[in-house]
Amino acid sequence: MTNDHPQPPAGTRAEPPGLTGSPFDSDTFTSATFVTVGRGPYLAVAAVWLVTRVGMVLLLLRDTLGIGGVRREVDLYRYWYGQFAQGTFPPGDVTWQYPPGAGLVIMSPGILPWLTYVQAFVALTLIADAVVTAALARADSARLTHGTWIWVCGLPLLLHLPLARYDVQTTALAVLALLALTARSTAAHQLGGALAGIGAMVKVWPALALIGTPRGRTTREAWTAAVVAALALLATLALFFSDSLGFLRQQGSRGIQIESLGGTALALAEAGGIWPGRVAFRYGAFEYVGPYVSSLGHLALLLTVIAFGWLLLWRVRAHRWTAATPLDAALTAVLLFTVTSRVISPQYMIWLLGLAAVCLTSRSTVMRPVALLLLPAAALSSLAYPVLYDHVVAGTTQGLTVMVLRNGLLLAATLLAARRLWTSTVTGPPEESA
């Protein structure tokens, strides 16, 4: 086998790869591009994780940045906790829009009775965060890829918001599912499928972790385990709690949230004086109301269906699978469903950062440039909420600029991910049989 990378003469020290060209597709593009960790990569990860998470906790304790009130979501969780204690899912609550498995996360602070609800929730979120970090680092024990660093350094770009939402726990299920699916054993495939199925019962999107499983035995094992785990969890919750499917009643009337791509289009139209709508607080979020909002919502649903159809077409046409294909497909799928959604909450970036980090644990991934686009998108999401959220709601020049840039990056990342997934698996040469 020939080596395209020239080796230094014996007795000389190799210099780091030059970055005069684009580093995105280079096999030598590693974590050193972001952070130099010296001889102790695991200690470096632990140190950076500790420092950044302490900073996030301090921000949450003060909770005065921008409009403040990020922690209010946990207070809502605590209210729902009281409903679960009475043996029912929140009845008739328009803000409860989550699958029944989310109830387990909401109830989980009860296992730490010596702490307040908020303290216990934050502690469990940090534990889930640490588990994701450890799993990413362990995914390649020979060297720390920049996947670990994307997660450790990317999550704090969202400031303290990840500690006040249950999306870190959901992302942990998806990350662990994908890492299990990369193993070769039946038990690992079944574990990955079960974790994805449980994740789908918590927040739906982790089911997309299975979209890229290789055809044949792996798909049968993983998808069967996912269905069994999801149905078992659903049946168990329905047995012990009433109104477990009540969340379905709260989904149909959702409008266009101001942070979605459709919301940005309406904001630009309003700023240009060609749309007479307004912003209203509905279903626990700020949405646009006015002419054409319903039509735009239907268009978003149509685009979601088209995105799903594209994923099915990709799966049928794909003929080249690498170790990274299931990871790349999961990130692409979640990006597609994010940008076509009527709702893009800031915590969606937690999902995308986690999936990007998993992709970058594999040398064969084609998602490196996509992951890099997500980092500034995460930082802009923090500007949108909570730092400049009053400007976003009011539709000022500052608010519009932030949303156009953030959603532009998300759209670019989605199109780039779809193109690179397609070209690497459909238009590339067929994979040779071993």
Residue ranges and their predicted role:
Residues 2-11, 19-249, 298-434:
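Multi-pass membrane glycosyltransferase architecture that uses lipid-linked
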Residues 288-300:
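Membrane-water interface at loop-to-transmembrane-helix junctions
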Residues 79-82, 92-116, 256-291:
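Short hydrophobic/aromatic helix or loop-helix immediately within or flanking a transmembrane segment
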